[in-house]
């Protein structure tokens, strides 16, 4: 996904495809699962402790930073996927008012404002 800020400092709208969302989710999920197996803790529970500064990370500082980062990516992409799905459902509901809903095989994309 390309993104940029224009000369006036205003964020530009960008698009992200469902393929990009799903690829990011798959990669983030794979990595967070490795950490869950290593530390015997769900990512959600880990992230709660991490966010509150309750972990004595010591020798695990790098692992914990990576785990938190990939978990945040996973959460962000899950939100993107939900927004994309809701937008498609809204369009399908509009179509349904006129009859049958047609689902095309063309890849949907989501416009996002990057912070």
What are these regions (language model features)?
Residues 2-115:
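Extended, charge-rich alpha-helical interface modules
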